[in-house]
UniProtKB/Swiss-Prot annotation:
Homohexamer. Its cofactor is Mg(2+). Keywords: ATP-binding, Cytoplasm, Kinase, Magnesium, Metal-binding, Nucleotide biosynthesis, Nucleotide-binding, Transferase. This is Ribose-phosphate pyrophosphokinase. It comes from Prochlorococcus marinus (strain SARG / CCMP1375 / SS120). Its EC number is 2.7.6.1. Belongs to the ribose-phosphate pyrophosphokinase family. Class I subfamily. D-ribose 5-phosphate binds at residues 209, 233, 237-241. It is found in: Cytoplasm. It catalyses: D-ribose 5-phosphate + ATP = 5-phospho-alpha-D-ribose 1-diphosphate + AMP + H(+). The keyword Cell membrane does not apply. One of its GO terms (biological process) is ribonucleoside monophosphate biosynthetic process. The active site is at residue 207.
Length: 327
């Protein structure tokens, strides 16, 4: 989004009834979104009692307003989710006209189906909890699987971080590109990414997962020799999947490997894996989840999705199309 676009929002938008409220999960991203739209965050008191209970109070009137709560449900996941639901409840009890939960990263998204007996579908449970808290709409980015949209009994707008990633990659003048899915489940995502990358060829890493957070790569389907391999995934958690894929691509002759993901979950030992020498030329992520300074490494590039989220918020408020942002 350009500065001119932001200025158009400031001049045309009825900001009197548009309110942005930030949780504690990613206040820097919330400030960037506020700057793009041209309004200040509503002040909020958020604290924890001695017994661990959370307390939230909205510090100004939001009666009759269109409220957008900005809160990725990242680590600590349960606290972030609970704080979001408490904020929703506080806004509804304060007579907000509509409350939209802006969730740049949706925690529990990987528990989107049963893979064994007697398991919970926690993504569906999380959606139910949010709806029960009173939220009217959800704006989520790069859900782990598309069917999660259907878990909500309210409107759920799904936006994508790929335009931000692709805009950055296009500045690098890369040649001989092949887009690689780190597993079979990510083929649709990688195919869409490859199409946006000037119809680049696609390769797939066939792997089998032996246990949670453990991945074993087996073989590459497709030609990666002497090419720039772009490994694309929705998130990087412990780094096992993406690093195993990069090692295999190097063995298969890829001249460079670039990892791209929307969500930098970065659970240990992600830092030590991703920062290893001669594995990645670059690791490109967005700021949907805040990356602590202690977890920065030489190859890491963090891109902001604030303008894209700000544009989506504006379009929801103005009842304009969001899908046209990604055509």
């Amino acid at each position: 989004m350009t500065a001119a676009t932001a200025q158009n929002i400031k001049s045309s938008l009825n900001t009197d009834r548009l309110k942005l409220i930030s949780g504690t999960s990613n206040p820097i991203l919330a400030k960037e979104i506020s700057s793009y739209i041209g309004i200040e965050d509503v002040p909020v008191v958020s604290k924890r009692f001695a017994d661990g209970e959370l307390y939230v109070q909205i510090q100004q009137s939001i009666r009759g307003c269109d409220v957008f709560l900005i809160q990725p449900t990242c680590a600590p996941v349960n606290d972030s989710l609970m704080e979001l639901m408490i904020m929703v409840d506080a806004c509804k009890r304060a007579s907000a006209r509509q409350v939209t939960a802006v969730i740049p990263y949706f925690g529990y998204a990987r528990a989107d189906r049963k893979t064994a007996g007697r398991e919970s579908i926690t993504a569906k449970l999380t959606a139910n909890l949010l709806v029960s808290s009173g939220v009217d709409r959800v704006l989520a980015m790069d859900l782990h699987s598309a069917q999660i949209q259907g878990y909500f009994d309210i409107p759920c707008d799904h936006i994508y971080g790929s335009p931000v990633l692709i805009d950055y990659l296009s500045t690098k003048n890369l040649d001989e590109i092949v887009v690689v899915s780190p597993d079979v489940g990510g083929v649709a995502r990688a195919r869409a990414f490859a199409k946006q990358m000037k119809d680049s060829p696609l390769a797939i890493i066939d792997k089998r997962r032996a246990a949670h957070n453990v991945a074993q790569s087996l073989t590459v389907i497709g030609d990666v020799a002497n090419k720039t391999a772009i490994l694309i995934d929705d998130m990087i958690d412990t780094g096992g999947t993406i690093c195993a894929g990069a090692e295999l691509l190097r063995k298969e002759g890829a001249k460079r490997v670039i990892a791209c993901a929307s969500h930098a979950v970065f659970s240990p030992p992600a830092y030590s894996r991703l920062s290893a020498d001669d594995l990645f030329e670059e690791v490109v992520v967005t700021n949907s989840i805040p990356v602590p300074t202690s977890q920065y490494f030489e190859q890491l590039k963090v891109l902001s999705v604030a303008n894209m989220l700000g544009e989506a918020i504006w379009r929801v408020h103005e009842e304009s199309s969001i899908s046209s942002m990604f055509r």
